[in-house]
Amino acid sequence: MNRIFKSIWCEQTRTWVAASEHAVARGGRASSVVASAGGLEKVLKLSILGAASLIAMGVVGPFAEEAMAANNAGVCLTYNGSSNNTSGTGGWFADGCKSAGWVQGMVTNSKTDWVGLTADDTQIVLDGSAGSIYFRTGGINGNVLTMSNATGGVLLSGLAAGVNPTDAVNMSQLTSLSTSTATGITSLSTSTATSIASLSTSMLSLGVGVVTQDASTGAISVGANSPGLTVDFAGGQGPRTLTGVAAGVNATDAVNVGQLASLSTSTAAGLSTAASGVASLSTSLLGAVGDLASLSTSASTGLATADSGIASLSTSLLGTADNVTSLSTSLSTVNANLAGLQTSVDNVVSYDDPSKSAITLGGAGVTTPVLLTNVAAGKIAATSTDAVNGSQLYTLQQEFSQQYDLLTSQVSSLSTSVSGLQGSVSANTGTASGDNSTASGDNATASGTNSTANGTNSTASGDNSTASGTNASASGENSTATGTDSTASGSNSTANGTNSTASGDNSTASGTNASATGENSTATGTDSTASGSNSTANGTNSTASGDNSTASGTNASASGENSTATGTDSTASGSNSTANGTNSTASGDNSTASGTNASATGENSTATGTDSTASGSNSTANGTNSTASGDNSTASGTNASATGENSTATGTDSTASGSNSTANGTNSTASGDNSTASGTNASATGENSTATGTDSTASGSNSTANGTNSTASGDNSTASGTNASATGENSTATGTDSTASGSNSTANGANSTASGDNSTASGTNASATGENSTATGTDSTASGSNSTANGTNSTASGNNSTASGTNASATGENSTATGTDSAASGTNSTANGTNSTASGDNSTASGTNASATGENSTATGTASTASGSNSTANGANSTASGAGATATGENAAATGAGATATGNNASASGTSSTAGGANAIASGENSTTNGANSTASGNGSSAFGESAAAAGDGSTALGANAVASGVGSVATGAGSVASGANSSAYGTGSNATGAGSVAIGQGATASGSNSVALGTGSVASEDNTVSVGSAGSERRITNVAAGVNATDAVNVGQLNSAVSGIRNQMDGMQGQIDTLARDAYSGIAAATALTMIPDVDPGKTLAVGIGTANFKGYQASALGATARITQNLKVKTGVSYSGSNYVWGAGMSYQW
């Protein structure tokens, strides 16, 4: 039969398609073409080449349709519901287009328009009716979608927004994600800033603390809401300087050094006024000597002036006394304020108001005075605003006392001079031999130019010299000697007082027996001596023999260069040394001793406090009876002792005897080198040890004890917490009553115990007694070697065992229990899940209530049970009771030895049987099922497909509802039946009932014994016959002589004639075929692009990729994804774009 074809434009597929001569194209774009045999061969060759490429690369996974025969290639065109024709190679296409075996179940004569290309088992089908393109490949590697061109990747456009977790996303979704992310970040930033501002406000509003500031007023308070009355500024190194102190106004205000300097200035002013009165008196006396006639008047005037001077001096002294009284009163007030303070961490100094102009100790508005202690000495200067301490005031009081004594001596000397003057008024027998000289008194001699000698036996031999007093002598130029037996022999020297001597140039000696022999020296006070250059001795029997030295106080001695001794019996013999306090001694160079009996003998040493001793170089002793004998040592506190080099002892009775040691706290002891003890009775005796806390002890080398009564006796050990004990080497105990006795052990938690070497116990009552064991959680126990217990009341007693979870128990060697109430008692067993149990050796139970009791058994899933040796149960309520049995799926059961059940409710009861699929049953020995509701009851039988049944021994049923009931029978295809012994049925609905019969094809029937029915609907009812059709549906057989009758086969000649006719008909289809070729090229490129996408790798769950391909200049891009649903099930899908066509495909495979 001849047909004429034409090509028309399909609006749905947007392609040119082949159609009947009677078809009309919408829009009138149809065109008639004449196809040539060469054109068809070209299309077929290209199709075969493209299909071969797909086979080599792999496309979408296999489908369930029947595969075509191998080594065949061809094309099948179907339109208007009927098959056009087929050009192919090989036996599969030898007799025309096949109606079955196409991808997606395509069947000839059942679809309106479709084109199929095949090469062996790899196919491409263009379904015009559905507007879809389908792919299938026999390969297993078609899992890569690659899109590329000569310069790189290609653009995939028109992509819809992804919905499912495995969908691709487009640019719109990505932009939306970026926008939402930016919004989230902005929101986070805003909320963070708000939180920080809130935190700042909360911190500023704190009412109790060390130093707080009100958030609203800015006022600073110190412990405003705490009841303590004492502020202690002392640090680890002693008192601190309080700077920025405003001048006190009220009786309870602190005073600064500026106020103290002002007081000193007013005192000096009083002294200056007294000196001015004395000078006025001397001038008057000189006038009396010049004119005897007016001597009486001048004397009276001088006496009056002297009286005035004395009165002024008295007034100044009274004013000074008032100032001292006022100062004493202020000091009494300060002392009263400071006396009321109690040491309190919660009480600190705060500003009274936001202006920060005043600070009231005890808080704003408090009228009860408080004591301010441990105030470092403030800087004394006119511009200083520093606070001063009691020591500085005491020194000022001592200096004032000395100046007062000096003034008393000067007034006494003045009284003597007046008495001598009165005697001179009666008789003047002195000799004045110098130019402009004056001599008054018996045997008075003034031989120097402008000299004055006033007094019995007084001598003024130096130019501009003045000698006033009995036996007074002024021999130095510009010298002055005032007082009985006073001597001023140095240039510009001044001797003021009975038997006073000033022999050094610019020297001054004031006081009875005072002696200033050094250049620029000053000696003030009875028996005071200043022999050093620029030295100053101030006080009764004081001595300043060192250059630039100063001795202030009764019996004070400053013999070192630049030394200072202040206080009764104080001694400063070291260069640049300072002794401040009664009987204080500073003998070391640059040393300082402050306090009664304080002693600083070491170089650069400092001793502060009664009976304090600093004998080490650069040492510091601060506190009553404190001792710092080690070089660079520091002792702070009553009876504190720092004897080790670079040691520090802080606190009453504290002792730091080790090199670089530190003891901080009452009765604390640090005897180990580099050791630190902090706290009452704390003891650090080990080298590099640290003890912190009351009664803490660190005796091990590099040990640390932190907490009340904590003990760290092991080398490199650490104990933290009340009664914590770390006795093992490198051990650590943290928590109340924790104990770490094993080497390298760690106990962390109240009452925790780590006694095994390298053990770790973390949690209340946790216990790790095994070597290398770890116990974590309350009441956890790890007693086995290398064991681990993690969870409340967990137990790991087996060697190398692990128990994780509340009440978890791992008692078997190398066992692991994970989950609440889990138990692993078998050797090498593993229990994972709540109440899971693994009692068999090498067993594994995973899931709530899972149980693995058999040796080498595995149970996975809720309530799963593996009781047989080497058995495996995987799935909720699954059961594997047979030896070596495997059950996979919910309620799956493998009860036979070596049996395997896979799928929900699957059952494999036969020995070595396999049941795969939901409700599948394999009851026969060595039987196999694969498919939902499939059944294999015969021994050695196999059933594949939904509801497939293999009842006969050695039978095989393949396909949905396939039945193989005969012994050794085979049924393949949906609804196929092989009931005869050794019978075979292939094809949907095929039926082989005869013994040894074969039925091949849809609906084929072979009922005769040893009969064969080939082809759809074929019937072989007679024994030992072969049928290729049925009555009324006969088929031709080729390669025979020319047929004559209606049922005869035709020969090659007849076939060639038929092919020639077909070619003549196809000549007019060339344009349509060319269009088809172009579409095929694009389709091949699209299909190839799908194959370029890599498959999901073993061990991974999901893979998403893109691919590209080019075939004969036609470019395609593809996007695909592969997902591994389970270990046996894998799904693949993809979409490809070429030109204006889209290709998509999906596949699924189940493997076992």
From Swiss-Prot:
Inducing or repressing factors: Expressed in vivo during the course of aerosol infection. Expressed at very low levels under routine laboratory growth conditions.
Residues annotated as signal peptide: 1-71
Spans annotated as Disordered: 420-886, 900-949
Domain of life per record: Bacteria
Bias (Low complexity) ranges: 443-504, 520-588, 604-630, 646-672, 688-714, 730-756, 772-840, 848-886
GO cellular component: cell outer membrane; cell surface
Outer membrane translocation of the passenger domain as annotated region, ranges: 1062-1099
Principal location class: other
Chain segments carrying region Translocator domain: 1100-1152
Record bears the keyword Ubl conjugation: no
Phenotype of the disrupted gene, per the record: Lafontaine et al. show that disruption of the gene reduces adherence to cultures of normal human bronchial epithelium (NHBE) but does not impair binding to HEp-2 laryngeal cells and A549 type II pneumocytes. In contrast, Campos et al. show that disruption of the gene decreases adherence to A549 cells and attenuates the ability of the bacteria to invade A549 cells. Mutant does not show a plaque formation defect. Mutation reduces the ability to disseminate and/or survive within the liver in a mouse model of infection. Mutation does not affect the virulence in a mouse model of aerosol infection.
Family to which the UniProt record says this protein belongs: Belongs to the autotransporter-2 (AT-2) (TC 1.B.40) family.
Domain comment as written in the entry: Contains a well-conserved 23 amino acid extended signal peptide region (ESPR) preceding a typical N-terminal signal sequence. ESPR region may be involved in regulating the translocation of the autotransporter across the inner membrane into the periplasm. The signal peptide, cleaved at the inner membrane, guides the autotransporter protein to the periplasmic space. Then, insertion of the C-terminal translocator domain in the outer membrane forms a hydrophilic pore for the translocation of the passenger domain to the bacterial cell surface.
Protein name: Autotransporter adhesin BpaC
Species assigned in the record: Burkholderia pseudomallei (strain 1026b)
Species lineage: Bacteria, Pseudomonadati, Pseudomonadota, Betaproteobacteria, Burkholderiales
